[in-house]
C-alpha cells in the first residue's frame, strides 16, 4: 500500500481506486503528485486528472509489464501532448525483469523510450545514466558510488542511446552532441 491508498477498499484490494493528491518537496519546489488508478475500470479519474497535470508518470510492474491501463494512459497523455515517463517498479521481486519491460516498451513505442536509470546487475542499487554514477542501497539511504565494472559496458551502450535520443530533441543539442559526443 502507498501513502495515497488510504481508503479501506483500496487497502483491501491493494490498488488505487480514486485519485488522491500527494505534495512532495524537491529542490526547493512543491510538486503535487496526483495518484490515479491504473486499472481501466477507473479511467474517468485519469481523464479528469489530465486537466490538472503538466506531465505523467506511468508505473509498470517488472513482473507484469505493459498493462491495458498503462496503454490507455499513454494514449491519453499523448493526445493531451503531455511529457510522459515510464517507471518500472517491483524490479527486486521474484520474476521481475526490468530489461524485459524496457524491451517491450521500446518495441511498442519506439526509440523514444530510453532509460535514465537502470537497476545494478547485482540488485543492490541503481545506475544514473545521465550522470554516469550508481547509488548503492545502505539501509534507509543510498551511497553514491562509481558504476560497477560488471555494468560498465552495458551502461556505456545505454548512455550513448540516451544521448542520441536527447540530441534529437533540438537542433542546438544535436550540434553539441555531434561536436562532443556528450550532452553534459
Where are these regions (language model features)?
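P-loop NTPase catalytic nucleotide-binding module
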Residues: 61-184
Amino acid at each position: 500500500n502507498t501513502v495515497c491508498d488510504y481508503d479501506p477498499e483500496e487497502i483491501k484490494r491493494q490498488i488505487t481506486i480514486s485519485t488522491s493528491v500527494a505534495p512532495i518537496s524537491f529542490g526547493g519546489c512543491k510538486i503535487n503528485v496526483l495518484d490515479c488508478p491504473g486499472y481501466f475500470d477507473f479511467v474517468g479519474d485519469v481523464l479528469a486528472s489530465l486537466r490538472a497535470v503538466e506531465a505523467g508518470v506511468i508505473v509498470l510492474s517488472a513482473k507484469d509489464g505493459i498493462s491495458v491501463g498503462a496503454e490507455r494512459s499513454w494514449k491519453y497523455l499523448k493526445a493531451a501532448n503531455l511529457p510522459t515517463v515510464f517507471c518500472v517498479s517491483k524490479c527486486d521481486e521474484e520474476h521481475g525483469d526490468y530489461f524485459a519491460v524496457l524491451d517491450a516498451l521500446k518495441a511498442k513505442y519506439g526509440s523514444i523510450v530510453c532509460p535514465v536509470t537502470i537497476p545494478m546487475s547485482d540488485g543492490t542499487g541503481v545506475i544514473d545514466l545521465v550522470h554516469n554514477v550508481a547509488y548503492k542501497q545502505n539501509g534507509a539511504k543510498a551511497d553514491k558510488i562509481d558504476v560497477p565494472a560488471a555494468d560498465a559496458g552495458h551502461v556505456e551502450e545505454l548512455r550513448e542511446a540516451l544521448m542520441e535520443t536527447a540530441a534529437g530533441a533540438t537542433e542546438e543539442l544535436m550540434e553539441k552532441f555531434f561536436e562532443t559526443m556528450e550532452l553534459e
